[in-house]
Amino acid sequence: RNIYCENDANCFALSEAKDGSASHYKIVFGVILGSGCGGGLVVDKKIISGKNNLSGEWGHNPLPFYGINEDISVLQSTLDTNLDIEKFISGKGLEALYFENFKKKISAKEIFSKKNENLKFIENFLNRLARSLSLLINIVDPDAIVFGGGVSNEIENLDLLRDMTGNFAGKKSIKTSFIKPKFGDASGVRGAAILGRDTIY
């Protein structure tokens, strides 16, 4: 019996590109913002893994830096040289940053549930996310970006996020569609099933 393995973010992207919310797009990038920060690239409904199987690992790039005061304070308050995007916009990253700022240990879900209390913190998160997504636009320029994962579920306005991303990508407006997944949290498992079926048959 053969066993096939694939990255969860790739499976998520495949599911949504095959017959999910991004089924009518050619180039689809799936973003998973959960405890970590992952991604998957699908072109013509096929996963693009790359020579090193790293094509979707955008979260391990350094956070684009624009001299934002809040970023400077983070750099000054830690000796950690890890400036990966994942450190700033993933669930675990947000929890660590929140503790550094307020000396309180709360979950990422709690941060967003107390929106009024944490408005500036959430604004900083969206700003960093938009900067990070601008890298995807400038390098891959996908037709659509599908957002999955617990942190993504907390983003209320994807159109606003798209406009912010466009500004950092050097255009006032971008045509890339920012969309929610049709199959929600089940899309990764579903994509794995699709991949297994297509590989065998």
Question: Which residue ranges define each predicted feature?
Answer:
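ATP-binding/phosphotransfer module of carbohydrate and carboxylate kinases, centering on a glycine-rich
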Residues: 16-24, 65-201
